[in-house]
Amino acid sequence: MSLIINTFYSNKEIFLQELISNASDALDKIRYESLTDPSKLDGGKELKIDIIPNPRECILTLVNTGIGMTKADLINNLGAIAKSGTEAFMEAFQSCAEISMIGQFGVGFYSAYLVAEKVAITKHNDEEQYSWVSSAGSSFTLHVDHGEPIDRDTKVILHLKEDQTEYLEERWVKEVVKKHPQFIGCLIAVYLEKEPEKEISDDEEEKGEKEEEDKDDKEKPKTEDVGSDEEDDTDKNNKKKTKKIKEKYTDREELNQTKPIWTRNPDDITQEECGEFYKSLTSAWEDHLAVKQFPVEEQEENEQLCVHHVWIMDSFDDLMPEYVGFVREDKENNKKLDEVFSKISWLGIHEDSINWRHLSELLWSHTFQSGDEMTSLSEYVSCMKEAQKSICDIIGECKEQVANSAFVEQEWKKGFEVIYMSEPIDEYCVQQLKEFDGKSLLSVTKEGLELPEDEEEKKIMEESNVKFENLCRLMKEILDKKVERVTISSRLVSSPCRIVTSTYS
């Protein structure tokens, strides 16, 4: 058991978060069942989680008013590692798609053994009270509990190890609740034993005793005793003696008073609620400066899966990747579909390491020769000249910019097609698509692009290299570290020069 616990968890404080999550699950279950059977709440209608530290006995107790557990639940859920009661519950209520269930006493329950030995006492609505006890070994005991009777509650008692008493401190409990389950859907309260010093006088100390005497004196005849002036002066000069005592009491404090306002309609949220939320979240005393409300996650609508004209389901997240988007079928808008969906496919190529090759067949782009029409990569490859070894592309801000670029002069002269990439996503995703149909993709703005040359062109290049060798050396000395090297290029036609980047930049 110790090996399993320490394998799952490296941070000990996670145990409180896990136990609160389990308690929240139990509360969600009883709340759900009470919708159809109100008698489920006969044992108490308040749904809450209480945290009770006891430093004197080194015990930390968590009590929730959730669904509770039967004897069979204790054996099946607590007695079997990682068995999830919530999983079984969700199987019984599959139609409940909006209730979030994490896992009632699954592996998270065993995180308690990071800091403690464990006792769980529970009572279900329909059974007597049982106690389940285990010390992180391979065995546990289960017996009828004749201690303090509880209603529908589940009480989890942690007998902390000697070196783990820090988890009983008020500061730590509040810090963990604020960090993790602060906005959980049920009330979380901590019960703290306070012992402040109080200064009292001798008269106050004896007040309790005198109250009884005064009660008896009321029944006796009253007599008036008039003292002398000397006695009055003496009383005035006498000062009351005081001393300090410690007064014990239990303080209950709600730890999650601020509710998750982001789950509500912005029109229903007041400025006062926004202010309370801001101060609770930031621990600030000042008022917030301004409020900006905007949705960061929209509900998907109008998506349905139908087979043979029969509706199957509305939610199918696992069936379609996020990058796949659809428009209603309209043959007249096929061109628009190509323009829109082609760019979404680029995103899919970057995100989907399995299907990127299939998605690349859906890509459409403008090219040098296509004009206003778009060309697929498959059509591009089929029209490539025999001497062309790579798929040429150029990235720019817009189609007009790349069409007039000096980088495509030689390609145009030789009649090679160049793919125009003028969308922001193109440069980001082309890094993943390094080849298509056996042809590598190479940008004309980078070095390494080889264009076919005849014998005459090769001879001219050799002569030019010799003729302008000193000029290239001088240009490199002038530019120094601003460039890696200066060379003669056959890729220019009318432009005097151009700057290219390295292949892997």
Curated annotation (Swiss-Prot):
Protein encoded by which gene: HSP90AB4P
Oligomeric and partner information: Homodimer.
Taxonomic placement: Eukaryota, Metazoa, Chordata, Craniata, Vertebrata
GO terms under biological process: cellular response to heat; protein folding; protein stabilization
Function text: Putative molecular chaperone that may promote the maturation, structural maintenance and proper regulation of specific target proteins.
Chief subcellular location: cytoplasm
Species the sequence originates in: Homo sapiens
Subcellular location: Cytoplasm
Membership in a protein family: Belongs to the heat shock protein 90 family.
Record carries keyword Flavoprotein: no
GO cellular component entries: cytosol; perinuclear region of cytoplasm; plasma membrane; protein-containing complex
UniProt keyword Membrane, yes or no: no
MF term (GO), any: ATP-dependent protein folding chaperone
Pfam families recorded: HSP90
Name of the protein in question: Putative heat shock protein HSP 90-beta 4
Origin superkingdom: Eukaryota
Gene3D superfamilies for the chain: 3.30.230.80, 3.40.50.11260, Heat shock protein 90, C-terminal domain (1.20.120.790), Histidine kinase-like ATPase, C-terminal domain (3.30.565.10)
Database matches in SUPFAM superfamilies: ATPase domain of HSP90 chaperone/DNA topoisomerase II/histidine kinase (SSF55874), HSP90 C-terminal domain (SSF110942), Ribosomal protein S5 domain 2-like (SSF54211)
Entry keywords, A to Z: ATP-binding, Chaperone, Cytoplasm, Nucleotide-binding, Stress response
